[in-house]
Amino acid sequence: VHSVVDYVSAAEYQVYPWGINDPTEGNRTTLHLPWLKTLSTDWHIDGKGWYSTTRGNNAIAQENPTGGPEYENNYRPKSPLFIFKYPYSKAMTPPSSYRDASITQLFYTTNVYHDVLYILGFNEKAGNFQINNWNKGGVGGDYAILNSQDGSGVNNANFATPPDGQPGRMRMYTWNASIPERDGCFEAGIVIHEYTHGVSNRLTGGPENSRCLAALESGGMGEGWSDFFATAIRLKPGDTRATDYTMGEWASNRPNGIRKYRYSTSLTTNPHMYVDADGLTSVHAIGNIWASMLYELLWNLIDKHGKGDVTKIRPVLKNGVPTDGRHLAMKIVLDGMALQPCLPNFVQARDAILDADKNLTQGSNKCEIWKAFAKRGLGVGAVFNLSKRTGS
């Protein structure tokens, strides 16, 4: 046992580190013990054993070229010394030639996100994804199943979220809009987007009910929350409210990304308003509107509280409140999910965020929150009607 502990204490991963969204933003780096150490465990144990592969309490990552339901016996890299360093370059082809690097990247990104969310409140009681909940509440037995290069599709990704106690399943695909084709596991925003579906489905309506985002508008907000967290996490030190971001631009090989409008605080660049949801039947289109509002909220809180050191993984909290505007926005949006009703609409989700801030900070950010939503038509007088919304 002591020798295994010694090896884990030397664990290394060659990956695009946290904050680098895709290969255009930086280089792969060898990271030593990247997990956040104050949490209950490292990434390779679950209370029952040590795993010298991409498996642990929070996730199990493997390839799935057939696209089938099996995963436990699928291929995953193994390293008795816990050294997960494998070759990858953007020119390598086919994707199967760099499967070890892909699986390792997926395992790394997901585990870091699990740790960040844990600090922000998505823990065992909230219904997070862990095999062992260490007697801290919730239902265990539900790590996230992570399929790299899943053969059930292309040019997309998805996350299936059953109730607490049953594993979530992420399917990451390859994208064929470029030569050579690209692996979505190397675009962190896509991985974070998909995992956030698990978060929003577990929190809304309670972890025992994972069908509370099944309506059109609530499902659209599910897409929006996923875009929002992916975008907030990729902020750079020099970013300002004039900085715009896209979604999925690297994997899709589209400079403008896969949404109608970039995320921007400019109404010229992104003119989306609440009433634009009238007549929409696509959850992704509705989500683009919701995430645009949350992007306004993000920058209002950053302008008030600062961005913090975005090169650091760990959120800094004082008395349970993030000290920077970026993580504060993430925290109240996360808390709002747990407060809103099952099958919420925009108005109800907005009110839940206001309630979350009231609970967390005694409402000290009320004005910044209202200004963000009112700028895009979800102000005090906004009224929900599926076919005829009232903006304000």
UniProtKB/Swiss-Prot annotation:
<keyword id="KW-0964">Secreted</keyword>
<keyword id="KW-0645">Protease</keyword>
<feature type="glycosylation site" description="N-linked (GlcNAc...) asparagine">
    <location>
        <position position="359"/>
    </location>
</feature>
<feature type="active site">
    <location>
        <position position="194"/>
    </location>
</feature>
<feature type="binding site">
    <location>
        <position position="197"/>
    </location>
    <ligand>
        <name>Zn(2+)</name>
    </ligand>
</feature>
<keyword id="KW-0865">Zymogen</keyword>
<dbReference type="GO" id="GO:0005576">
    <property type="term" value="C:extracellular region"/>
</dbReference>
<feature type="propeptide">
    <location>
        <begin position="1"/>
        <end position="9"/>
    </location>
</feature>
<dbReference type="GO" id="GO:0004222">
    <property type="term" value="F:metalloendopeptidase activity"/>
</dbReference>
<dbReference type="InterPro" id="IPR027268">
    <property type="entry name" value="Peptidase_M4/M1_CTD_sf"/>
</dbReference>
<dbReference type="InterPro" id="IPR050371">
    <property type="entry name" value="Fungal_virulence_M36"/>
</dbReference>
<protein>
    <recommendedName>
        <fullName>Extracellular metalloproteinase 4</fullName>
        <ecNumber>3.4.24.-</ecNumber>
    </recommendedName>
</protein>
<dbReference type="Pfam" id="PF02128">
    <property type="entry name" value="Peptidase_M36"/>
</dbReference>
<keyword id="KW-0482">Metalloprotease</keyword>
<feature type="glycosylation site" description="N-linked (GlcNAc...) asparagine">
    <location>
        <position position="176"/>
    </location>
</feature>
<keyword id="KW-0843">Virulence</keyword>
<keyword id="KW-0378">Hydrolase</keyword>
<feature type="glycosylation site" description="N-linked (GlcNAc...) asparagine">
    <location>
        <position position="385"/>
    </location>
</feature>
<dbReference type="InterPro" id="IPR001842">
    <property type="entry name" value="Peptidase_M36"/>
</dbReference>
<keyword id="KW-0325">Glycoprotein</keyword>
<keyword id="KW-0862">Zinc</keyword>
<dbReference type="GO" id="GO:0006508">
    <property type="term" value="P:proteolysis"/>
</dbReference>
<dbReference type="GO" id="GO:0008270">
    <property type="term" value="F:zinc ion binding"/>
</dbReference>
<comment type="similarity">
    <text>Belongs to the peptidase M36 family.</text>
</comment>
<feature type="glycosylation site" description="N-linked (GlcNAc...) asparagine">
    <location>
        <position position="27"/>
    </location>
</feature>
<feature type="binding site">
    <location>
        <position position="193"/>
    </location>
    <ligand>
        <name>Zn(2+)</name>
    </ligand>
</feature>
<comment type="function">
    <text>Secreted metalloproteinase probably acting as a virulence factor.</text>
</comment>
<keyword id="KW-0479">Metal-binding</keyword>
